[in-house]
């Protein structure tokens, strides 16, 4: 299979999409089919007390029978009463870790005869990626990063190399965590685009099956290699009902009406002081956020000074050094840094990229050690917005 496929594959229109049903054992054969086609397959697995993306070669490593419990500042795994393969919501990782990695060596240099010789480093993966278990909010996050790193004025060649030709197997959410709010953001829980295949897991008296939707021609080709039967109207109704139930389970929401103007008009709201008293500026929220894209560049040398490397690493607007310029730091308080992050995510992102930078995954709530809840911060500002006006 060619490794230089364009990022945007030819998709099947909604009216042409084909639905089929496969039994649970076919998931292992799906992984094998993707491997045969030359993909390096990544999927969910349990590691260090969390469900994370990692390289998989079979269905054995999937989180069978596990679910997650999430609340502000809390994440725990627990056993389910069934053998669901995807019976969880989201872990701390997203596809950002693979498409826009935490660190990448840009180039290295060696000193020879008194001068440095630049050595370019290969940043393109040896095989294209295939991702299994991608949620609707994560698909939306990839679309956001595409807009930022591929479609903006400055194209990121490293992101393009890693994004190109990626095969995406989405999994429709059939349950929600207490920190999810994708329904209010219009980003889930149903995946509607951006996938090659979408699975809806049905576990119950009817057995353990998956309703499969082909979102691209190559997705349909892969399903053709598996044992499947056409989905009936009853199958489709059950799948739709399961996803609708996940939307109803969500207990958090952001009222997005006029949110850009709301935040722009409330720079001096007392809530910013309140949240600053709780924020640790640890940058957890930006590390787990699937859309945050800020990086820094560092040059390192060995002790002899004969070898040097330039690395690009994730950075965060919560660190003091991020906003340091000649003469001082323009955001030297937790108040200023949190306000910058939330206002950018929910307001100025729209001016830059034409859409919100938040997909409602709830990771910033779950993984904040102080339990700060972005939905509550927005609500507090909206309810007391007169305080922020001059």
Residue ranges and their predicted role:
Residues 2-264, 269-272, 303:
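Iron-sulfur-associated redox domains of electron-transfer enzymes in respiratory
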Residues 37, 282, 361:
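Single, functionally critical "micro-switch" positions that shape active/binding sites
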Residues 40, 285, 364:
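Residue-level detector of anion-binding/catalytic polar loops
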Residues 256-277, 295-390:
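Ferredoxin-type iron-sulfur electron-transfer modules in oxidoreductases and energy-metabolism complexes
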Residues 276-286:
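Extended amphipathic alpha-helical segments enriched in small hydrophobics
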Residues 284-300:
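A donor-sugar binding/catalytic signature common to diverse glycosyltransferases
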